């Protein structure tokens, strides 16, 4: 049994593994964007009134919705357009004039917030969430159509304008939505109901509730669509009406969690149920998507391959070569911007495969050297990395620093040193780390960065040891206070909206503590 300051880490990890195997959705935080699209597209679906109530409850004091630093633009437009649709369609009539007035006031406040947000978007570009430019273009168009419409008691407010996304939206609507990756955005395509090219997987079209609703159409569909209706009904019931950013991110949650825990040295027998689940999921095609309904991607595949290899289950990395562009790998096809974290995960998968003498060891080692050089070029001047799949630089920096340190080959010490200094310089007074405030997720990433790059040989820098110990103290206080419900803080992963994976966060926290518990230099520092 592994314990740390009275915490039975092995028992906690066993419970988490059982949860990760059982939970086929993995996302626990509802999305304002996705919920707004369901209000507009599927008023027939169970939970419609609750979704409207959720939008009203989530509106901020400034009239907007969503996260900070530009992340509010997409959810704000979605919520405003949804409420305007409710008013225009007459959904609020049955609830009486007071309810309609509440909705109208929310929409007008939202319109003013959207106009200000889009002024910023026009100046600095769209937020880094998935498909943001074309989503903004489509919703701006829809909001302005509502604002100019003849509906009684129409919402009044400033016109919303932005110059971004029109070309991307035109390509999507012109037929690009048929590309499997882009079916995820089917809700932006008029007349998409019943499109034969969209093929549901486990009921989900494009891994998105909004895309599925667009495919089902504005009226309750017939028996042939029963699997998709059932999927949406069950998904909305998890949150009492609202919907998450994806219909499922089960393989992301499982693969990343297994990788965190395997890297920390957790006994393979404890991880066996999760290991075997992922190995079985990987078998048919050699690649994995983030969740059912999405196309396979190099990132989820690489993390899975790495985690399995660490636990002695070697699988061929052949699927990864489909994403090789030369200097770096793409995450998906097509891709506009490469991902630093995905390339770091591919470096780890290929590096571990090469270290174990797999059949493609030579090719993997050569690719690992290329990726390490590319990651070094992408390191920011301050020593950290940023990534398109996550709002926090602590996520990307953990992935890149550890990958380069373990698998990048000789000559990478300066790159890793800069990353460690960057992490040390951003610790908060309470021992935590975080972009906007200290969070369990980001603190776990920072602690892992320090432990896995500075304590591999059994001794480490005392400054680094104390920083890691203070971070662990913060995490232990959270575990004692909240038990199984480790707060993940604000959603940080990038989908169409920001989203969180609580199981993954808990795995990262437990892995950080497990790693610290194996290092006397860290454990012996009392920071309680």
Question: In which residue ranges do the predicted regions lie?
Answer:
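Helix-turn-helix repeat elements of alpha-solenoid scaffolds
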Residues: 9-14, 187-189, 316, 320-323
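Alpha-helical repeat/alpha-solenoid scaffolds of the HEAT/ARM/MIF4G superfamily
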Residues: 145-159, 317, 322, 326
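Nucleic acid-processing catalytic cores of prokaryotic defense/repair systems
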Residues: 60-65
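A short helix->beta-strand "capping" segment at the edge of beta-propeller domains
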Residues: 8-21, 193-197
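An alpha-helical repeat/solenoid feature that recognizes helix-turn-helix modules
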Residues: 1-8, 24-50, 67-94, 116-151, ...
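Edge strands and adjacent loops of beta-rich recognition modules
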Residues: 184-196
């Amino acid at each position: 049994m592994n314990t740390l300051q009275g915490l039975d880490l092995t028992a906690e990890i066993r419970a988490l593994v059982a949860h990760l195997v059982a939970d086929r959705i993995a996302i626990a935080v509802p999305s304002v964007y996705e919920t707004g699209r369901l209000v507009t597209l599927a008023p027939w679906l169970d939970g419609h009134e609750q979704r409207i109530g959720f939008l009203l409850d989530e509106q901020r004091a400034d009239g907007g919705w969503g996260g900070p630093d530009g992340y509010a633009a997409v959810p704000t437009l979605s919520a405003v357009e949804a409420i305007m649709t409710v008013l225009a369609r007459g959904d609020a009539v049955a609830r009486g004039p007071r309810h309609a007035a509440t909705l109208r006031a929310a929409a007008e406040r939202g319109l003013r917030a959207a106009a200000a947000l889009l002024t910023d978007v026009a100046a600095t570009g769209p937020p880094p969430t998935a498909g943001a430019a074309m989503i903004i273009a489509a919703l701006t168009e829809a909001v302005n159509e509502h604002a100019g419409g003849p509906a009684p008691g129409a919402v009044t407010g400033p016109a919303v304008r932005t110059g971004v996304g029109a070309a991307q939206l035109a390509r999507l609507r012109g037929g690009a939505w048929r590309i499997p990756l882009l079916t995820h955005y089917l809700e932006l395509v008029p007349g998409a109901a019943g499109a034969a090219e969209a093929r549901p997987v486990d009921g989900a079209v494009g891994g998105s509730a909004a895309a599925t609703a667009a495919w089902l159409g504005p009226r309750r569909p017939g028996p042939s669509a029963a699997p998709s209706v059932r999927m949406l009904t069950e998904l909305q019931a998890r949150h009492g009406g609202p919907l998450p950013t994806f219909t499922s991110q089960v393989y992301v949650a499982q693969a990343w969690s297994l990788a965190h825990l395997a890297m920390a040295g957790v006994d393979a027998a404890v991880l066996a149920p999760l290991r075997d689940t992922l190995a079985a999921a990987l078998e048919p095609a050699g690649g994995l998507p983030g969740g059912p309904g999405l196309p396979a991607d190099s990132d989820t595949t690489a993390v899975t391959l790495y985690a399995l290899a660490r636990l002695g289950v070697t699988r061929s990395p052949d699927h990864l070569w489909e994403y090789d562009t030369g200097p770096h790998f793409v995450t998906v096809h097509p891709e506009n911007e490469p991902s630093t974290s995905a390339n770091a995960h591919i470096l780890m998968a290929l590096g571990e495969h090469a270290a174990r003498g797999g059949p493609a060891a030579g090719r993997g080692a050569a690719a690992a050297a290329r990726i390490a050089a590319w990651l070094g070029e992408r390191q920011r001047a301050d020593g950290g990395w940023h990534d398109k799949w996550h709002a926090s630089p602590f996520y990307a920096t953990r992935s890149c620093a550890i990958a380069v340190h373990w698998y990048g080959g000789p000559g990478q010490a300066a790159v890793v040193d800069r990353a460690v200094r960057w992490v040390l310089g951003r610790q908060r007074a309470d021992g935590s780390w975080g972009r906007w405030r200290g969070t369990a997720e980001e603190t776990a990433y920072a602690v892992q960065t320090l432990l896995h790059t500075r304590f591999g040989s059994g001794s480490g820098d005392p400054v680094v040891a104390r920083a890691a110990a203070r971070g662990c103290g913060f995490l232990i206080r959270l575990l004692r206070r909240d038990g199984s419900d480790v707060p993940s803080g604000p959603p940080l992963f990038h989908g169409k909206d920001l989203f969180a994976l609580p199981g993954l966060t808990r795995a990262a926290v437990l892995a950080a503590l497990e790693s610290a518990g194996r290092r006397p230099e860290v454990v012996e520092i009392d920071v309680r």
